[in-house]
């Protein structure tokens, strides 16, 4: 196809979602790369990695991951779960994060490497430029923390040109979204350990 035709067809993909990945091979999808790059909505490398990981995934699924950046599987919002006093979870923070910083997401499983943070937890580089510092938190005495819990969904990091696969066997917690923006996070959880990973 010519560039004008490709741009027109790609526009249809973006505007109406009428194209599906099952109608496009990786080679055909690559024809849209220039258009994708101009709009900042995709790349050949991340599209190929997405299709390798999701053979039945569509171009619409790909665009939804790029644009919505949802931590949850498509169409889901996490399952309401209660963390009780003494429950623990792990969190990656920026290397230069102040000691009192408590992020918004934690994970049940222990974090053992930066590769784990990037790939299993699907943490994009513009979310955390560094992630060597891991903190373990515990829910405060007398507290029940109502969170959303669920598997870690993939992310597409266009800035780094990477498909970050996530891990649907793991449990992540959206810790404070249900509580509003005015709360003090330290009223709910406290740090019990901090360690460095490579």
Residue ranges of model-derived segments:
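Catalytic toxin/effector domains delivered as secreted proteins or via bacterial secretion systems
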Residues: 16-198
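Hydrophobic, membrane-inserting alpha-helical segments
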Residues: 1-22
């Amino acid at each position: 196809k010519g560039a004008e035709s490709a741009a027109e067809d790609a526009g249809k993909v973006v505007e109406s979602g009428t194209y599906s990945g099952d109608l496009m091979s990786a080679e055909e999808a690559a024809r849209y790369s220039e258009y994708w790059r101009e709009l900042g909505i995709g790349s050949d490398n991340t599209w190929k990695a997405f299709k390798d990981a999701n053979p039945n995934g569509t171009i619409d699924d790909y665009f939804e991951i790029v644009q919505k950046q949802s931590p949850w599987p498509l169409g889901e919002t996490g399952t309401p779960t209660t963390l009780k006093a003494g429950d623990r979870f792990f969190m990656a923070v920026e290397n230069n994060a102040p000691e009192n910083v408590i992020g918004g997401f934690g994970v049940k499983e222990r974090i053992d490497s930066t590769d784990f943070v990037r790939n299993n937890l699907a943490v994009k580089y513009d979310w955390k430029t560094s992630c060597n510092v891991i903190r373990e938190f515990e829910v405060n005495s007398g507290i029940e923390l109502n969170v959303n819990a669920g598997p870690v969904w993939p992310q597409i990091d266009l800035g780094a040109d990477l498909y970050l696969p996530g891990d649907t066997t793991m449990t992540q917690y959206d810790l404070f979204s249900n509580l509003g923006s005015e709360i003090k996070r330290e009223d709910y959880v406290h740090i019990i350990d901090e360690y460095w990973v490579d």
